[in-house]
Amino acid sequence: MEKFLQAEFPYASIGDYTVAGMGKSYIIGHTRLQSVYYTDPFIRPALVVNGIRMATVEEIIAMKLDIISRAGRKKDFWDLHELTQNYTLAQMLALHEERYPYSHDAKTIKANFSNFAKADDDIDPECLLGKHWEVIKMDMIDFVKRG
């Protein structure tokens, strides 16, 4: 298995566990920085497109809210802003609670939907939809008020 992964992927890291019950971990990708290592189980079955497993939108919402709960970055608000078109705040909070039942704190998440202190210093993502940071912030505040 190790030889195959190292031959097929530019970056392949094989975990060095000596405890048999822990199994083996493999991190693969193009570079170390582009590789993903994730241990939490998904709350929805993964999407499989052309043999590539991907997280569902619901899964991504839960993960983004988890980041927001600890003061999100500009890109997180940008992503969530797009998702507010199809999901209510209650739906988003329910997904976060389902995925992170032990750390879920709806009050903190709601408060952090309008806490842009950390994000304001980030560079603006390149938005192909022509959105602007100041508008996104106002929309996020309104989203929570409507919530």
Question: Over which residues does each language-model region extend?
Answer:
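Compositionally biased terminal segments of proteins
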Residues: 1-147
